[in-house]
Design a protein with these regions (language model features):
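Preference for intrinsically disordered or flexible, low-complexity segments
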Residues: 2-199, 266, 278, 285-464
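Short hydrophobic alpha-helical segments enriched in small aliphatic residues
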Residues: 198-201, 207-211, 228, 232-234, ...
Length: 464
Protein backbone atom coordinates (compact mmCIF):
# COMPACT_ATOMS: atom_id res chain seq x y z
CA UNK A 1 0.00 0.00 0.00
CA UNK A 2 1.39 3.36 -1.01
CA UNK A 3 2.00 5.82 1.80
CA UNK A 4 1.35 9.52 1.67
CA UNK A 5 4.23 11.73 0.62
CA UNK A 6 6.61 12.33 3.51
CA UNK A 7 10.25 13.10 4.13
CA UNK A 8 12.73 10.28 4.56
CA UNK A 9 13.00 9.72 8.33
CA UNK A 10 16.78 9.25 8.10
CA UNK A 11 17.96 12.27 6.07
CA UNK A 12 14.89 14.46 6.50
CA UNK A 13 15.29 15.81 2.95
CA UNK A 14 14.10 13.47 0.21
CA UNK A 15 10.38 12.97 -0.34
CA UNK A 16 9.26 9.33 -0.42
CA UNK A 17 5.91 7.60 -0.88
CA UNK A 18 6.64 4.36 0.97
CA UNK A 19 7.67 3.12 4.39
CA UNK A 20 11.38 2.95 5.17
CA UNK A 21 14.15 5.24 3.96
CA UNK A 22 14.98 6.86 0.62
CA UNK A 23 17.19 5.33 -2.07
CA UNK A 24 20.11 7.62 -1.25
CA UNK A 25 20.12 6.59 2.40
CA UNK A 26 19.88 2.91 1.46
CA UNK A 27 22.86 3.31 -0.86
CA UNK A 28 24.86 5.06 1.86
CA UNK A 29 24.14 2.18 4.22
CA UNK A 30 25.29 -0.29 1.58
CA UNK A 31 28.44 1.72 0.99
CA UNK A 32 29.19 1.72 4.72
CA UNK A 33 28.78 -2.05 4.84
CA UNK A 34 31.22 -2.61 1.96
CA UNK A 35 33.83 -0.23 3.35
CA UNK A 36 33.70 -2.09 6.67
CA UNK A 37 34.21 -5.58 5.25
CA UNK A 38 37.05 -7.66 6.63
CA UNK A 39 39.66 -9.24 4.36
CA UNK A 40 38.06 -12.65 4.84
CA UNK A 41 34.64 -11.28 3.92
CA UNK A 42 36.02 -9.69 0.76
CA UNK A 43 37.77 -12.93 -0.22
CA UNK A 44 34.52 -14.82 0.26
CA UNK A 45 32.69 -12.34 -1.97
CA UNK A 46 35.34 -12.66 -4.69
CA UNK A 47 35.06 -16.46 -4.66
CA UNK A 48 31.26 -16.26 -4.71
CA UNK A 49 31.29 -13.88 -7.70
CA UNK A 50 33.74 -16.06 -9.65
CA UNK A 51 31.79 -19.23 -8.83
CA UNK A 52 28.42 -17.73 -9.78
CA UNK A 53 29.60 -15.51 -12.62
CA UNK A 54 26.78 -16.78 -14.85
CA UNK A 55 24.35 -14.86 -12.63
CA UNK A 56 25.98 -11.47 -13.07
CA UNK A 57 23.83 -10.50 -16.03
CA UNK A 58 20.70 -10.86 -13.89
CA UNK A 59 21.56 -7.51 -12.24
CA UNK A 60 20.93 -8.98 -8.82
CA UNK A 61 23.12 -10.17 -5.93
CA UNK A 62 26.24 -11.13 -7.90
CA UNK A 63 26.15 -8.00 -10.02
CA UNK A 64 25.66 -5.79 -6.97
CA UNK A 65 28.48 -7.49 -5.07
CA UNK A 66 30.91 -7.16 -7.97
CA UNK A 67 30.00 -3.52 -8.51
CA UNK A 68 30.42 -2.67 -4.84
CA UNK A 69 33.87 -4.29 -4.60
CA UNK A 70 35.01 -2.75 -7.87
CA UNK A 71 33.77 0.78 -7.33
CA UNK A 72 34.29 1.28 -3.60
CA UNK A 73 37.39 -0.85 -2.98
CA UNK A 74 38.95 -0.80 -6.44
CA UNK A 75 39.06 -4.60 -6.53
CA UNK A 76 39.48 -6.14 -9.99
CA UNK A 77 40.49 -9.71 -9.26
CA UNK A 78 41.96 -11.91 -12.05
CA UNK A 79 39.88 -14.85 -10.83
CA UNK A 80 36.70 -12.98 -11.63
CA UNK A 81 37.98 -11.90 -15.06
CA UNK A 82 39.07 -15.46 -15.92
CA UNK A 83 35.72 -16.89 -14.84
CA UNK A 84 33.88 -14.34 -16.98
CA UNK A 85 36.07 -15.02 -20.02
CA UNK A 86 35.63 -18.79 -19.67
CA UNK A 87 31.86 -18.33 -19.55
CA UNK A 88 31.99 -15.84 -22.44
CA UNK A 89 30.30 -13.20 -20.32
CA UNK A 90 31.29 -9.68 -21.32
CA UNK A 91 28.89 -7.46 -19.39
CA UNK A 92 29.56 -5.40 -17.44
CA UNK A 93 32.82 -4.67 -19.30
CA UNK A 94 34.43 -3.47 -16.06
CA UNK A 95 34.89 -7.18 -15.27
CA UNK A 96 37.99 -6.96 -17.45
CA UNK A 97 39.66 -3.86 -16.06
CA UNK A 98 43.43 -4.48 -16.21
CA UNK A 99 42.80 -8.20 -16.74
CA UNK A 100 45.94 -10.35 -17.24
CA UNK A 101 47.27 -11.14 -20.70
CA UNK A 102 45.74 -14.63 -20.89
CA UNK A 103 42.30 -13.06 -20.45
CA UNK A 104 43.15 -10.39 -23.02
CA UNK A 105 44.20 -13.09 -25.49
CA UNK A 106 40.90 -14.90 -24.94
CA UNK A 107 39.02 -11.68 -25.72
CA UNK A 108 41.09 -11.12 -28.86
CA UNK A 109 40.42 -14.69 -30.04
CA UNK A 110 36.71 -14.17 -29.45
CA UNK A 111 36.78 -10.93 -31.42
CA UNK A 112 38.58 -12.63 -34.33
CA UNK A 113 35.95 -15.37 -34.44
CA UNK A 114 33.01 -13.03 -34.75
CA UNK A 115 31.29 -12.25 -38.02
CA UNK A 116 29.52 -9.09 -39.07
CA UNK A 117 26.15 -10.56 -38.07
CA UNK A 118 27.17 -10.69 -34.39
CA UNK A 119 26.68 -6.99 -33.73
CA UNK A 120 25.77 -7.19 -30.05
CA UNK A 121 28.61 -9.54 -29.14
CA UNK A 122 31.07 -7.43 -31.15
CA UNK A 123 30.03 -4.40 -29.13
CA UNK A 124 30.36 -6.23 -25.81
CA UNK A 125 33.80 -7.70 -26.58
CA UNK A 126 35.14 -4.34 -27.78
CA UNK A 127 33.90 -2.70 -24.57
CA UNK A 128 35.57 -5.44 -22.52
CA UNK A 129 38.85 -4.98 -24.39
CA UNK A 130 38.63 -1.22 -23.86
CA UNK A 131 38.50 -1.79 -20.10
CA UNK A 132 41.34 -4.33 -20.27
CA UNK A 133 43.31 -1.62 -22.04
CA UNK A 134 46.94 -2.78 -22.02
CA UNK A 135 49.57 -1.91 -24.65
CA UNK A 136 48.66 -4.80 -26.93
CA UNK A 137 44.99 -3.86 -26.80
CA UNK A 138 45.94 -0.28 -27.66
CA UNK A 139 47.90 -1.53 -30.66
CA UNK A 140 45.00 -3.75 -31.74
CA UNK A 141 42.51 -0.88 -31.54
CA UNK A 142 44.84 1.33 -33.57
CA UNK A 143 45.24 -1.36 -36.23
CA UNK A 144 41.46 -1.81 -36.43
CA UNK A 145 41.12 1.97 -36.70
CA UNK A 146 43.52 2.07 -39.64
CA UNK A 147 42.25 -1.12 -41.30
CA UNK A 148 38.63 -1.69 -40.26
CA UNK A 149 37.15 -5.16 -40.45
CA UNK A 150 33.97 -5.72 -42.49
CA UNK A 151 31.95 -5.79 -39.28
CA UNK A 152 32.87 -2.15 -38.59
CA UNK A 153 29.99 -1.08 -40.84
CA UNK A 154 27.56 -2.76 -38.46
CA UNK A 155 28.71 -0.68 -35.49
CA UNK A 156 27.87 2.91 -34.63
CA UNK A 157 31.46 3.81 -33.77
CA UNK A 158 35.03 2.75 -34.43
CA UNK A 159 37.67 1.56 -32.00
CA UNK A 160 38.80 5.16 -31.43
CA UNK A 161 35.46 5.71 -29.65
CA UNK A 162 35.35 2.32 -27.96
CA UNK A 163 38.71 3.10 -26.34
CA UNK A 164 37.09 6.04 -24.55
CA UNK A 165 34.76 3.66 -22.72
CA UNK A 166 37.84 2.42 -20.89
CA UNK A 167 39.06 5.95 -20.15
CA UNK A 168 41.74 6.31 -22.84
CA UNK A 169 42.19 7.26 -26.49
CA UNK A 170 44.82 7.37 -29.20
CA UNK A 171 45.76 9.92 -31.85
CA UNK A 172 46.34 9.59 -35.59
CA UNK A 173 49.82 8.23 -34.94
CA UNK A 174 48.57 5.63 -32.46
CA UNK A 175 49.94 7.41 -29.40
CA UNK A 176 47.88 6.60 -26.34
CA UNK A 177 46.39 9.28 -24.08
CA UNK A 178 44.67 8.79 -20.75
CA UNK A 179 41.31 10.53 -20.40
CA UNK A 180 41.14 10.10 -16.63
CA UNK A 181 43.16 10.83 -13.51
CA UNK A 182 44.15 7.65 -11.67
CA UNK A 183 43.81 9.46 -8.35
CA UNK A 184 40.38 10.34 -6.99
CA UNK A 185 39.15 12.49 -4.09
CA UNK A 186 35.65 12.58 -2.67
CA UNK A 187 33.86 15.87 -2.07
CA UNK A 188 31.31 15.34 0.68
CA UNK A 189 28.47 17.48 1.82
CA UNK A 190 28.90 18.93 5.31
CA UNK A 191 25.53 19.06 7.00
CA UNK A 192 24.66 22.43 8.46
CA UNK A 193 23.49 22.33 12.06
CA UNK A 194 20.28 24.07 11.09
CA UNK A 195 19.26 21.30 8.71
CA UNK A 196 16.82 18.63 9.81
CA UNK A 197 18.17 15.29 11.01
CA UNK A 198 21.70 16.38 10.24
CA UNK A 199 23.49 13.29 11.52
CA UNK A 200 23.86 10.04 9.63
CA UNK A 201 25.99 7.42 11.37
CA UNK A 202 27.93 7.96 14.55
CA UNK A 203 31.63 8.71 14.25
CA UNK A 204 33.74 5.57 14.13
CA UNK A 205 36.43 4.86 16.72
CA UNK A 206 40.15 4.40 16.11
CA UNK A 207 39.86 0.64 16.55
CA UNK A 208 37.42 0.27 13.66
CA UNK A 209 39.46 2.61 11.50
CA UNK A 210 42.54 0.45 12.08
CA UNK A 211 40.56 -2.64 11.11
CA UNK A 212 39.72 -0.99 7.79
CA UNK A 213 43.36 -0.18 7.10
CA UNK A 214 44.40 -3.72 7.97
CA UNK A 215 41.76 -5.12 5.64
CA UNK A 216 42.93 -2.97 2.79
CA UNK A 217 46.37 -4.46 2.93
CA UNK A 218 44.78 -7.87 2.51
CA UNK A 219 42.56 -6.74 -0.33
CA UNK A 220 45.60 -5.60 -2.23
CA UNK A 221 46.69 -9.20 -2.75
CA UNK A 222 43.37 -9.92 -4.41
CA UNK A 223 43.91 -7.16 -6.94
CA UNK A 224 47.25 -8.42 -8.18
CA UNK A 225 49.00 -11.70 -8.68
CA UNK A 226 52.10 -10.19 -7.09
CA UNK A 227 51.46 -8.50 -3.76
CA UNK A 228 54.08 -5.85 -2.97
CA UNK A 229 54.46 -3.55 0.00
CA UNK A 230 53.87 -0.63 -2.37
CA UNK A 231 50.47 -2.06 -3.26
CA UNK A 232 49.60 -2.41 0.42
CA UNK A 233 50.61 1.15 1.20
CA UNK A 234 48.66 2.60 -1.73
CA UNK A 235 45.51 0.67 -0.94
CA UNK A 236 45.75 1.50 2.77
CA UNK A 237 45.86 5.17 1.83
CA UNK A 238 42.81 4.60 -0.34
CA UNK A 239 40.83 3.21 2.57
CA UNK A 240 41.95 6.04 4.81
CA UNK A 241 40.55 8.43 2.22
CA UNK A 242 37.23 6.62 2.10
CA UNK A 243 37.10 6.71 5.88
CA UNK A 244 37.82 10.45 5.95
CA UNK A 245 35.12 11.04 3.36
CA UNK A 246 32.56 9.27 5.52
CA UNK A 247 33.79 10.93 8.70
CA UNK A 248 33.47 14.32 7.01
CA UNK A 249 29.82 13.61 6.42
CA UNK A 250 29.28 12.48 9.97
CA UNK A 251 31.13 15.35 11.55
CA UNK A 252 29.15 18.12 9.92
CA UNK A 253 26.19 16.05 9.74
CA UNK A 254 28.29 11.24 -29.55
CA UNK A 255 31.22 13.60 -29.59
CA UNK A 256 31.01 16.88 -31.44
CA UNK A 257 34.00 18.12 -33.43
CA UNK A 258 32.77 21.59 -34.29
CA UNK A 259 34.82 24.37 -32.80
CA UNK A 260 33.00 27.18 -31.09
CA UNK A 261 34.18 30.72 -30.43
CA UNK A 262 34.28 32.14 -26.94
CA UNK A 263 31.61 34.78 -26.34
CA UNK A 264 32.68 36.56 -23.19
CA UNK A 265 31.40 39.99 -24.20
CA UNK A 266 27.94 38.69 -25.00
CA UNK A 267 27.76 36.90 -21.69
CA UNK A 268 28.92 40.00 -19.79
CA UNK A 269 26.22 42.06 -21.47
CA UNK A 270 23.63 39.42 -20.67
CA UNK A 271 24.44 39.70 -16.98
CA UNK A 272 23.16 43.26 -16.73
CA UNK A 273 19.75 43.88 -15.25
CA UNK A 274 19.63 40.63 -13.31
CA UNK A 275 16.86 40.67 -10.73
CA UNK A 276 17.22 37.96 -8.11
CA UNK A 277 14.59 36.81 -5.67
CA UNK A 278 15.19 37.22 -1.94
CA UNK A 279 15.90 33.49 -1.68
CA UNK A 280 18.60 33.72 -4.33
CA UNK A 281 20.15 36.75 -2.65
CA UNK A 282 20.20 34.97 0.68
CA UNK A 283 21.73 31.93 -0.97
CA UNK A 284 24.51 34.07 -2.45
CA UNK A 285 25.37 35.54 0.95
CA UNK A 286 25.21 32.17 2.66
CA UNK A 287 27.34 30.57 -0.05
CA UNK A 288 30.00 33.26 0.24
CA UNK A 289 30.17 32.83 4.00
CA UNK A 290 30.19 29.05 4.02
CA UNK A 291 32.50 28.11 1.15
CA UNK A 292 35.04 30.91 0.80
CA UNK A 293 37.95 28.98 2.32
CA UNK A 294 37.18 25.56 0.87
CA UNK A 295 39.42 24.28 -1.95
CA UNK A 296 36.34 22.90 -3.70
CA UNK A 297 33.16 24.92 -4.15
CA UNK A 298 29.95 23.73 -5.79
CA UNK A 299 26.95 25.80 -6.86
CA UNK A 300 28.29 29.30 -6.32
CA UNK A 301 26.03 32.15 -7.60
CA UNK A 302 27.59 34.49 -10.16
CA UNK A 303 25.04 37.24 -10.81
CA UNK A 304 25.28 36.40 -14.52
CA UNK A 305 22.09 35.74 -16.44
CA UNK A 306 21.60 32.87 -18.90
CA UNK A 307 21.13 34.16 -22.42
CA UNK A 308 18.55 31.46 -23.13
CA UNK A 309 16.22 31.13 -20.13
CA UNK A 310 17.22 34.01 -17.84
CA UNK A 311 18.18 31.77 -14.91
CA UNK A 312 21.20 32.84 -12.89
CA UNK A 313 24.41 31.16 -14.00
CA UNK A 314 26.27 29.16 -11.36
CA UNK A 315 29.91 28.35 -10.89
CA UNK A 316 28.99 24.70 -10.64
CA UNK A 317 32.57 23.79 -9.77
CA UNK A 318 35.55 25.78 -8.50
CA UNK A 319 38.88 24.11 -7.67
CA UNK A 320 41.75 25.97 -6.04
CA UNK A 321 45.02 25.40 -7.85
CA UNK A 322 47.13 25.95 -4.71
CA UNK A 323 45.43 23.19 -2.71
CA UNK A 324 48.09 20.51 -2.00
CA UNK A 325 45.56 17.68 -2.19
CA UNK A 326 44.67 18.76 -5.74
CA UNK A 327 48.29 18.90 -6.91
CA UNK A 328 47.78 15.75 -9.01
CA UNK A 329 45.51 17.78 -11.32
CA UNK A 330 48.44 20.05 -12.29
CA UNK A 331 46.21 23.14 -12.37
CA UNK A 332 48.04 26.31 -13.37
CA UNK A 333 45.24 28.52 -12.00
CA UNK A 334 41.93 28.03 -10.23
CA UNK A 335 39.61 25.89 -12.35
CA UNK A 336 36.07 27.22 -12.79
CA UNK A 337 33.18 25.57 -14.62
CA UNK A 338 30.19 27.86 -15.10
CA UNK A 339 26.82 26.86 -16.50
CA UNK A 340 23.10 27.48 -16.34
CA UNK A 341 21.43 24.92 -14.03
CA UNK A 342 18.41 24.82 -16.33
CA UNK A 343 20.09 24.67 -19.74
CA UNK A 344 23.00 22.39 -18.79
CA UNK A 345 20.72 19.53 -19.78
CA UNK A 346 20.82 20.56 -23.44
CA UNK A 347 23.95 22.74 -23.73
CA UNK A 348 27.61 21.83 -23.49
CA UNK A 349 29.42 24.68 -21.75
CA UNK A 350 33.08 25.62 -22.09
CA UNK A 351 34.96 27.99 -19.79
CA UNK A 352 38.35 29.63 -20.23
CA UNK A 353 40.12 32.17 -18.05
CA UNK A 354 41.10 35.39 -19.82
CA UNK A 355 44.45 37.08 -19.06
CA UNK A 356 42.67 39.31 -16.52
CA UNK A 357 41.11 36.29 -14.80
CA UNK A 358 37.56 36.71 -16.11
CA UNK A 359 35.60 33.69 -17.34
CA UNK A 360 35.18 33.49 -21.10
CA UNK A 361 32.11 31.36 -21.66
CA UNK A 362 31.09 29.54 -24.83
CA UNK A 363 28.57 26.83 -25.55
CA UNK A 364 27.54 24.14 -27.99
CA UNK A 365 23.80 23.65 -28.34
CA UNK A 366 20.63 25.62 -27.67
CA UNK A 367 19.13 26.19 -24.25
CA UNK A 368 15.54 26.43 -23.06
CA UNK A 369 13.24 29.41 -23.50
CA UNK A 370 11.99 29.17 -19.92
CA UNK A 371 13.74 28.83 -16.56
CA UNK A 372 12.74 25.53 -14.94
CA UNK A 373 15.14 25.75 -11.98
CA UNK A 374 13.03 26.72 -8.98
CA UNK A 375 14.10 29.32 -6.44
CA UNK A 376 13.80 26.61 -3.79
CA UNK A 377 16.32 24.41 -5.60
CA UNK A 378 18.53 27.43 -6.23
CA UNK A 379 18.58 28.39 -2.56
CA UNK A 380 19.05 24.80 -1.45
CA UNK A 381 22.01 24.15 -3.77
CA UNK A 382 23.75 27.45 -3.10
CA UNK A 383 23.33 27.04 0.65
CA UNK A 384 25.03 23.65 0.78
CA UNK A 385 28.50 23.29 2.24
CA UNK A 386 31.05 20.86 0.85
CA UNK A 387 34.36 19.56 2.13
CA UNK A 388 37.22 17.97 0.23
CA UNK A 389 37.87 14.49 1.59
CA UNK A 390 40.76 12.08 1.24
CA UNK A 391 41.73 9.73 -1.56
CA UNK A 392 39.23 7.03 -2.49
CA UNK A 393 39.03 4.32 -5.15
CA UNK A 394 39.33 5.70 -8.72
CA UNK A 395 35.88 4.22 -9.33
CA UNK A 396 34.30 5.61 -6.16
CA UNK A 397 31.86 7.75 -8.13
CA UNK A 398 30.68 4.69 -10.05
CA UNK A 399 28.97 3.11 -7.03
CA UNK A 400 26.01 5.44 -6.89
CA UNK A 401 25.19 9.07 -7.56
CA UNK A 402 25.93 10.15 -3.98
CA UNK A 403 29.05 12.32 -3.71
CA UNK A 404 30.97 14.57 -6.04
CA UNK A 405 34.33 13.14 -7.06
CA UNK A 406 37.39 14.96 -8.37
CA UNK A 407 39.60 12.85 -10.60
CA UNK A 408 39.08 9.12 -11.05
CA UNK A 409 36.76 7.54 -13.59
CA UNK A 410 33.33 8.82 -14.57
CA UNK A 411 30.24 6.66 -14.36
CA UNK A 412 28.40 7.52 -17.55
CA UNK A 413 24.63 7.34 -17.31
CA UNK A 414 24.50 6.95 -21.09
CA UNK A 415 27.48 6.42 -23.44
CA UNK A 416 30.95 7.82 -22.82
CA UNK A 417 30.89 11.50 -23.83
CA UNK A 418 34.33 13.03 -23.82
CA UNK A 419 34.13 16.56 -25.21
CA UNK A 420 36.24 18.18 -27.90
CA UNK A 421 38.24 21.21 -26.80
CA UNK A 422 36.97 24.27 -28.69
CA UNK A 423 40.48 25.75 -28.78
CA UNK A 424 42.71 22.91 -30.01
CA UNK A 425 40.25 20.23 -31.13
CA UNK A 426 41.72 17.63 -28.78
CA UNK A 427 39.76 15.22 -26.62
CA UNK A 428 39.20 16.56 -23.12
CA UNK A 429 39.98 14.71 -19.88
CA UNK A 430 37.54 13.83 -17.11
CA UNK A 431 37.97 16.18 -14.15
CA UNK A 432 34.96 15.83 -11.85
CA UNK A 433 31.58 14.16 -11.53
CA UNK A 434 28.77 16.10 -9.86
CA UNK A 435 25.58 14.20 -8.89
CA UNK A 436 23.34 17.14 -9.71
CA UNK A 437 20.10 15.23 -9.23
CA UNK A 438 21.15 14.13 -5.74
CA UNK A 439 21.56 17.76 -4.72
CA UNK A 440 18.20 19.02 -5.92
CA UNK A 441 16.06 15.90 -5.43
CA UNK A 442 16.00 15.33 -9.17
CA UNK A 443 18.12 13.23 -11.47
CA UNK A 444 21.18 13.48 -13.67
CA UNK A 445 24.93 13.94 -13.45
CA UNK A 446 27.18 16.79 -14.61
CA UNK A 447 30.55 15.69 -16.00
CA UNK A 448 33.25 18.37 -15.88
CA UNK A 449 36.23 17.91 -18.19
CA UNK A 450 39.49 19.74 -18.85
CA UNK A 451 41.87 20.33 -21.72
CA UNK A 452 45.20 20.43 -19.92
CA UNK A 453 46.91 22.02 -22.90
CA UNK A 454 44.51 24.95 -23.31
CA UNK A 455 43.27 25.22 -19.69
CA UNK A 456 39.69 25.02 -20.93
CA UNK A 457 36.96 23.41 -18.82
CA UNK A 458 33.91 21.84 -20.41
CA UNK A 459 30.86 20.09 -19.10
CA UNK A 460 27.95 17.96 -20.18
CA UNK A 461 24.91 16.43 -18.50
CA UNK A 462 23.40 12.95 -18.68
CA UNK A 463 20.34 11.38 -17.12
CA UNK A 464 18.21 8.28 -17.58
Amino acid sequence: MQSKAHLCPKCGENTIYFDGICHSCRQKQRREEILNLSADEVEAMILKIADRIDEIEKWDEIYNDFWALFSLLGIHDPRIARAAAAAEIYCPPELYFCAPKDVRDALVRKLASLQDNAKNTLNDVLCALAWQGDEQTTQLFYELYQNPKPWRQKLYAGTEIYAQIGGWSFDEAGERKSLVFNKCLAVVRARDSAEKNGGCASERGDENANEILNFKGGAGSANSEQNTQKDVDEISNLHAGAQSARTGMDEDASLRNERVNFKADAQKDASSGLNLSENAKDARCECANQNADEPVQIGRPTGQKCEFCGCEMLDMLRLKADEPRLAFLNLKRDAIFRCCPTCVGSVRYFCKRSPDGEIELSHDGEGFDENYFSQEDFARLCGMKFKLGGEVSPFYGCFSELDTTVGGYPQWVQDAEYLTCPSCGGTMKHLAQIPFGEMIEGEGVIYVQICEKCEVLGGCFQCT
